[in-house]
């Protein structure tokens, strides 16, 4: 069981930071286009990266184009579409591609099927697809069955359930593999990985970080293999501030009576 995270890592330690975005750095909204990362949080991320030789990356199911737009004016190393696309510290991209015919056929099937499922939404990511049902939770089972059908018919694809979404992505891509790839490269190599995420899609990342002796942090409720837990997105924001300004940590700890439980075990 994940324990409440109660002590922020020291800036002098040799850490590499990885953050999911939706539900971790930004509150989840009814539609993905409504999500915003507060500018102050982006500034904290940039400061944290600077204190760690640039060893900070965003790891998300969103595309890298979306991540760059949400992170403006800052530019971080990224893994988008659950690791199907990745950009390293030098700006070099690594992209998993599917045959164009497969993409066309899958997208056509999904679009035609979703017409009969009002309230659902198809998001095409080029090499992956997201079937959203936040506005129509009654269609969850139908979308899972549809995704299972697709992955059985096209074995190069894999199903990834998430929060009010079912993802169809290239087989073998996940956030854990993306983190592992970053950890083989400068400036991440040789550091202790820290990964913060909130969803089922983040569990592969937690597994890789745990195996490396790092710090895995689950945001919110639910079963997880993460070792630590923060209750909400605002708690992540406060934790980021503590990491960046450790001299203020004691004051924050003294203000927990507002309902924020800080950290309960030393990292």
Swiss-Prot record:
Cofactor: Mg(2+)
GO molecular function terms listed in the Swiss-Prot or TrEMBL record: magnesium ion binding; trehalose-phosphatase activity
Pathway(s) it belongs to: Glycan biosynthesis; trehalose biosynthesis
CDD domains, alphabetized: HAD_TPP
Keywords annotated in UniProt: Hydrolase, Magnesium, Metal-binding
Record's keyword annotation contains Magnesium: yes
GO BP annotations, alphabetical order: trehalose biosynthetic process
InterPro entries: HAD-like_sf (IPR036412), HAD-SF_hydro_IIB (IPR006379), HAD_sf (IPR023214), OTSB-like (IPR044651), Trehalose_PPase (IPR003337)
Membrane-crossing segments per the record: none
Enzyme class per UniProt: hydrolase
Residues the record marks as active site: 20
Catalytic activity from the UniProt record: alpha,alpha-trehalose 6-phosphate + H2O = alpha,alpha-trehalose + phosphate
Family that this chain belongs to: Belongs to the trehalose phosphatase family.
Role this protein plays: Removes the phosphate from trehalose 6-phosphate to produce free trehalose.
PANTHER family named among the record's database cross-references: TREHALOSE 6-PHOSPHATE PHOSPHATASE
Protein name as annotated: Trehalose-phosphate phosphatase
